A protein has these predicted regions:
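A broad, low-specificity signal marking well-ordered, structured residues that form hydrophobic/aromatic
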Residues: 3, 39, 75
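A structural detector for beta-sheet-dominated domains
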Residues: 6, 42, 78-80
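Secondary-structure transition/turn motif
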Residues: 13-16, 42-46
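Generic domain-boundary/flexible-linker signal
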Residues: 21, 36, 50-52
Length: 103
């Protein structure tokens, strides 16, 4: 599976699920229950994907990529499987953000 992120939302490409379109997606910046900073992807009120980003600078860098260079700015994050633990996902995001900030 692969997450494609742009300023309008997220497209999830996977062999098991249909393509998710940006208008079906909502982001949340934190979980109200415990104020934990997260980037969560909801599709039709189902939490499809959630990544804790506890580092505020990294979270802001990541979110700024969604707006960089307008709507043609797309960030692809390849995922071998959706069943990553939070530490593994954190590392994937760190690498993806670093690569995209260099461009």
């Amino acid at each position: 599976p692969q997450l494609t992120l742009n300023q309008e939302g997220v497209t999830l490409h996977t062999t098991r699920l249909p393509i998710v379109y940006w208008h079906e997606i909502d982001y949340v910046g934190e979980r109200v229950s415990d104020n934990t900073p997260v980037l969560a992807v909801f599709v039709k009120d189902v939490e499809l994907y959630c990544q804790r980003i506890t580092n505020e600078k990294m979270r802001n860098n990541f979110l700024s990529l969604l707006n960089k260079h307008g709507s043609n700015r797309v960030m692809n994050i390849s995922l071998n499987d959706l069943d990553y633990d939070s530490d593994e996902l954190q590392d994937i995001f760190k690498m993806a953000v670093a690569r995209n900030l260099e461009q």
